[in-house]
């Protein structure tokens, strides 16, 4: 009886040690694009809660308020979003994605999808075999076809819809990160 109990305790502790090792070895990256600063605030809280590295996706030409005027069909964002194959240039940054197991990717929702600069980011690096969890901020629309459209830019990654984080506080973000 004691030998069975000893084996059970040994197996239990070995399983717990493996869990801890996988958590330690699992490296996360929070990558984000933020035109107005709202998504950036959420990304910083997520990175802190997840103990993850932070990577800002920056356009070579920053967006102005006029560029973001979705009511103007000739504004930069309206034009970009009407042509799905458009890829805005981003500031190039050296980044070895092979060091990350999980990418938490954030952006504002534009026209029910991610801004096309997110496609630029996904096509610029190799995300083969990576888990990509999305988060977004939005003035009213949800994820829509976001996962489907982004999957085309990273076909060998596993992309999942995460959460809309409109007005989320540190506690809510921390709870969400723990659930990942």
What are these regions (language model features)?
Residues 50-52, 130, 157:
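A structural micro-motif
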Residues 10, 15-102, 112-114, 119, ...:
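N-terminal beta1-alpha1-beta2 submodule of the flavodoxin-like/Rossmannoid cofactor-binding fold
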Residues 97-98, 123-129, 153-154:
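Short, conserved loop/helix-junction motifs that constitute active-site signature segments
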Residues 111-112, 140:
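Acidic catalytic loop of the alpha/beta-hydrolase fold
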Residues 107-108:
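Glycine-rich, N-terminal phosphate-binding loop of Rossmann-like dinucleotide-binding domains
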Residues 133-169:
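Short, glycine-/small-residue-rich phosphate/pyrophosphate-handling segment
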